[in-house]
Amino acid sequence: MASSMLSTATVASINRVSPAQATMVAPFTGLKSTPVFPTTRKTNSDITSITSNGGKVQCMKVWPTLGMKKFETLSYLPPLTREQLASEVEYLLRSGWIPCLEFELEHGLVYREHARVPGYYDGRYWTMWKLPMFGCTDAAQVLKELDELIKHHPDGYARIIGFDNVRQVQCISFLAYKPPGA
């Protein structure tokens, strides 16, 4: 008896037309063969309108793998001018970091000295030039110390480091001087 009453209630609810059924989407009937977009295509010779980067790839170069050593963060750029060095040092000082100069007389890049795998000391640590410049507020002071370093070691590499004494990490490091012929 209960099952017959349930089925009668179900049939009654199906036969009723509700507002929700009036707004239902038509069922999917398959893909239509009529084109939605126009079939004519405008030829455009402008390379920027092409969606693929095929034309742009021809403009790219592969960096030579032999004879081109990479030193620090900005080493893919041409050597920095005096004004560009001053600008980088000013950024370092504005960020609240402490400038520090380091130099290396033999190798200006990370190298593997003791094994085939990179070790802890293999070319990553350079000799510090004097002490970190605590309290330095002017980029000219840092560049003056850089000039003094270059005068003492003209055949060495020099880099400028920005050290954050709160987090106790090195935040910026870039090559400031390469010896002639390097």
Swiss-Prot record:
GO annotations of cellular component type: chloroplast
Chloroplast listed as a keyword: yes
Residue stretch of the organelle transit peptide: 1-58
InterPro entries referenced in this protein's UniProt entry, alphabetically: RuBisCO_ssu, RuBisCO_ssu_dom, RuBisCO_ssu_N, RuBisCO_ssu_sf
Biological processes, Gene Ontology terms: photorespiration; reductive pentose-phosphate cycle
One Pfam family hit: RbcS
Localisation per UniProt entry: Plastid, Chloroplast
Main location: plastid
Keywords noted in UniProt: Calvin cycle, Carbon dioxide fixation, Chloroplast, Photorespiration, Photosynthesis, Plastid, Transit peptide
Example of a GO MF term: ribulose-bisphosphate carboxylase activity
Other information: The basic functional RuBisCO is composed of a large chain homodimer in a 'head-to-tail' conformation. In form I RuBisCO this homodimer is arranged in a barrel-like tetramer with the small subunits forming a tetrameric 'cap' on each end of the 'barrel'.
Stated family: Belongs to the RuBisCO small chain family.
Oligomer and partners: Heterohexadecamer of 8 large and 8 small subunits.
Biological function: RuBisCO catalyzes two reactions: the carboxylation of D-ribulose 1,5-bisphosphate, the primary event in carbon dioxide fixation, as well as the oxidative fragmentation of the pentose substrate. Both reactions occur simultaneously and in competition at the same active site. Although the small subunit is not catalytic it is essential for maximal activity.
Record-given protein name: Ribulose bisphosphate carboxylase small subunit, chloroplastic
